[in-house]
Amino acid sequence: MDTTNRTTLIIDGNWLLMSRLGMMMGDFVNTLPAEYLEKAKNEMIDFVAQSINKIINYWGPRIDNIMMVQDGGSWRKTLPKPALITEEYKGNRVADEEIAWNYVWDALKTLCHNFEVNHITCVTEKNIEGDDWCWYWSRYLNHVGINTIIWTSDADLKQLVQRDPTTNAWTVWFNDRSGLVVNEAEQHSDMDMLLNFDAVDPFLEQICDRVEHLTYINPDNIVMSKVICGDQGDNIKALIRVEHTTNKGKVRINRVSEKEWNKVKEELGIKTIEDFKHNKERIIQHLRMLPRFAECKDSMGDLLDMFDYNMSLVRLHKEQIPREFQLAMNKHKDEYLITDLDYLRNNYKVLAAHTEPVEELFKDLPF
C-alpha cells in the first residue's frame, strides 16, 4: 500500500476555546472591571496557545502542519422545518447572561489573527459551521495526499474517519482524554497481516501506537444513530416520539433508544449509509411496530420528511451541504499554509512547577 506521512492537525477552534473557558468561567463575569476582563482575555489566549503547543509536542514529528477552523454561523438554521418540528436547530443553547461574551469571542478572533500573522491556516465563513470546515479540509487534504487528525471532543466529527480510495491518505478523530478513533476498515488481525502485509499502513500504526485509548468504528453509525435517536445537545429530535401519561399524571415522551435502533438495524441488515438511505420506509415501519410506539399517529410522509431533515442536520457530506457553501469553502483552499512546527516547538518552554509565572508560550510569537 502506497501511503503518505504528511499529516495536518485540524483544530476545532470553538471547542478548544469553550473547553478552556469552562476552567476560567469566573474570570469572565460581566460585572468585573474592564481591565480585569481584558487581562482574563489575554490569559485565555495564552491558555489556548499553551494547549495547542502541548498537543504539537505530543504528536511530535508525526504531524507536520496545523490549522484551525471556527464557526461562522449555521446554514442549517435556515432549512425549512418539516411538519413535525417546531423547535430551532440548537435553539436550546442559551448563552449565560452573566458572562462577558464579547471578551470571549474577541479572544478567539485575536487568536485566529495571530495564527494568520504567523503563517498558520485559520478559516471562517459566514453561515458555515466548524464541522463543515472539518469535513471540507479533511476531504480536500486527503484527496491531495495529506492525512488529517481532527482534534476535538465533538462526537459528530467521528463520522469523518476514512481513507481516501485514490491517495490512501486518512482522517482520524482525536481527543486528549477519549483517545483516537479510526475507521474500522483499518483494524487488522494477525492473520490479515500474514496474508496481506501490504494492507497495513506503518505510519498509521505509529499514530495508533502513540495513544492509550484506541477505538475502531463504522463512521456511518454516528450519522444513522443521531438521525434516528436525535440529540438533545443540538436540539435534534428523535425520528419517532410518542407522548404518554404516567400513573401519576405526568406526561412523558418515548423516544427511540440506541438499543432499540441497534436491534432494528440488525434485523434489517443496515450496515452502511447507503443501506440507510435506501431503506428509510422499512426502517420507519419497523420502528413503529415496536410496542412503545404503537400509538404513533404521525403519517409516513411526515416521518420521511423528518428523516431527510435530520440527515441534513447531521450528515457531513457533499449530498447534504448546499452547493453554495461548498463553493464558498472551496474558495479558501489556496489559504492552506505550511507552518514551521519546528520553530514553534523550539520556541516553547514549559515550567516544571507552577510556583513561578508561566513564560511566554510561543517565545517570539504574539500569543
Language-model segment annotations:
Residues 2-148, 157-183, 187, 315, ...:
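Noncatalytic, basic helical substrate-engagement surface that gates or grips nucleic-acid strands
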Residues 126, 137-254:
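Long, highly charged, low-complexity intrinsically disordered interaction regions
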Residues 204-325, 354-359:
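Accessory alpha-helical DNA-binding modules that contact the DNA backbone or grooves
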Residues 1-4, 44, 302-307, 312-367:
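Low-complexity, acidic/Ser/Thr- and charged residue-rich accessory regions of DNA metabolism proteins
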Residues 19, 50, 54-57, 106, ...:
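Charged/polar, solvent-exposed surface patches and flexible loops
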Residues 62, 151, 307-309:
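Short, basic and Ser/Thr-rich N-terminal targeting/leader segments
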Residues 117-120, 270, 350-353:
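Short aromatic/hydrophobic-glycine micro-motifs
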Residues 71, 90, 95, 102-104, ...:
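Compositionally biased, intrinsically disordered low-complexity regions enriched in proline and serine
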